[in-house]
Structures are given as C-alpha cells and as structure tokens.
C-alpha cells in the first residue's frame, strides 16, 4: 500500500502571469506558499487486473477491467477526469485501487485540481518505480491538465503542490520554470503565517472559464488585461523584496495593491459579495487581501496584524463567513506510507518504510 499527500496553496501575487498567453510574451512570476491542507491518494494492489478509482469528496467511483477499458476523457468535468487523464498519460499496465480524499472542498481557489494531479502522479510513479524530480512532476501534471484535459490553466499550482514551501516562481518566455525558495528569517516567516487569515466565501467554482476569457484578452496587444497583469507581476516582485527585508506592513499594503490590479483584469474575478466582505475586513483593520485563485469565489485571504485580528474575525463571523485555520507546508508532494506488507504489493518496495513528515523530499 502507498499513501501520498500533496498540499494546496495560497498565491500572494503574480497570478495570471503563469498562463502561457502571458509568459510566452513577457515572462511571468508568482509568489506563493503551500499550506497544510492536503489531498491524499491511497493505492492498494489488486490481484484481478482491474483498476478502481473512488473519490470520497465527490462520492464517485469507477471500475474498469484494465487500462484499455478506460473511457475517453470527457469534454466537461465528470469528477474522475483527472485520475483518468493521469492513468492514460502513464499508459502503464497496473491493477490497483485508488482512493482519493481531501481536506478542503474542490473549487475553492486553493489549487486543489493541480494538487490532485500532482499527488496521483507522485503515488503512481512511485508504485511503478519511475522516479520524477519535483520539476518533472510539476511540469508533467501541468501538461496533463493543459493538453490532456484541454483546460485553460497556468503553471503555478502544480509547482506549489510539487515543491511545497514559500516560493518565488519564474516562468520564462521559452516555457522554462525556475523555483526560488525564499529564505526568510524564522521570526519573519512565523509572523507572516500568523498575520494571514483565510475565510471561505461559500462560493465554490471552476476557474477554467475565467482563465479562458483572460487568455483571450491577454493575446490582444495593448489591451487593459495586459497592463493589469504587468501591475500584478510588479506587485509580486515588490512583495518578495518586502518579505526579504522583513517589512511585513508593506507586504500587507502590497496585497491590497495587487488585488485592486487583479480585479481590473476581468469583471468576473470579484463580485459584489466579495467586494463587500473585503471592505468589511479592511474597515476592521486589515491591511490587504485578495481572493485566492483565479477569482469568482472560494477563499478570501486577509492580511491583518495581531491587534486587529479579533476585530476582523468578529466582523466576518457577523457576515456568516467561516475562518479556516492553516499553517505553511514545507514538504510538497510526498509518499508518507510505503508498506508492501499491507496488501502483498511487491511494487511498493522491498521493505516496510515510513517516511517521516519532517523529512525533505529530493528535488
């Protein structure tokens, strides 16, 4: 048996510049961190040659006689399209039960779809003894979603899930990606984590249609979306410098600047409800914030110093919005249990192994 997990992420700045329509013209960059809300895959060996996939979150399952019997990838979301796409991409004969579960609901703007894909790839390639570096893992997951499922997605989510940690990620015009882990003073990192708050707006969504419209407008030379994305990218670079200097107050104000720029990319990124909630948080003392992900719903990220947090929390509770506690994740995608004795799976390893959560995976 194999058990793997991968984190979701919160993005501070640069979102949208990780789309090919932008970075192929100008180069993109994103500042983000992985958090300790995880997607899990449990793989158990089968002796009958069949493949079974069960999603506990979506309450869906599929059972097929072998790889050749897998259905064609659906044009629209069916709930199991990501595991199907990963299995087809690997193209390897295997007989396994795959049980999928997560700590957060889908469509909440935290990059959960990318985390699903990265996690499945990590577990299945471990099972098949096909080692992938973190870069290879992230890039392959992106290609599966972008080209296999034909979804309008950027690259940042896959890299956040694969690497973990607080990263400054650059996307080159040539399609290359560079991940720079930010080495912050321990006190600064702890204060940053403490000053961030997440509130669920209650609106789950799929971001692909928003991103599709954004890509179309980004390819128009000199359009308003392009200028807004330039501002978002510049804000991300300034946020990095603020963190490295330990100037968290400036970081909070930059979040506000970046959010205002991001809203001008598309009218669908925010809503009257989101604007109202953000205004309530700001009136309660928050310095900045943003909707996580492409927009349209999901989690509202707020930056508030300790003296203001109770006021922000109380105001948001009065609005019927639930807070989700979290911490930063530094590990990224990993196999946390590799036990060949549970189901006599000789592919799982030559001996029982438990990988401590504190161990760092190799790049």
Name what the model sees in each region:
Residues 297:
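Glycine-rich active-site/cofactor-binding loop and its immediate structural neighborhood
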Residues 87-108, 140:
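Glycine- and acidic-rich phosphate- and metal-coordinating loops
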Residues 1-13, 17-19, 24, 30-33, ...:
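C-terminal nucleotide
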Residues 69-77, 107-114, 131:
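Short gly/ser-rich anion-binding loops that grip negatively charged ligand groups
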Residues 39-40, 105:
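Histidine-centered metal-chelating micro-motifs
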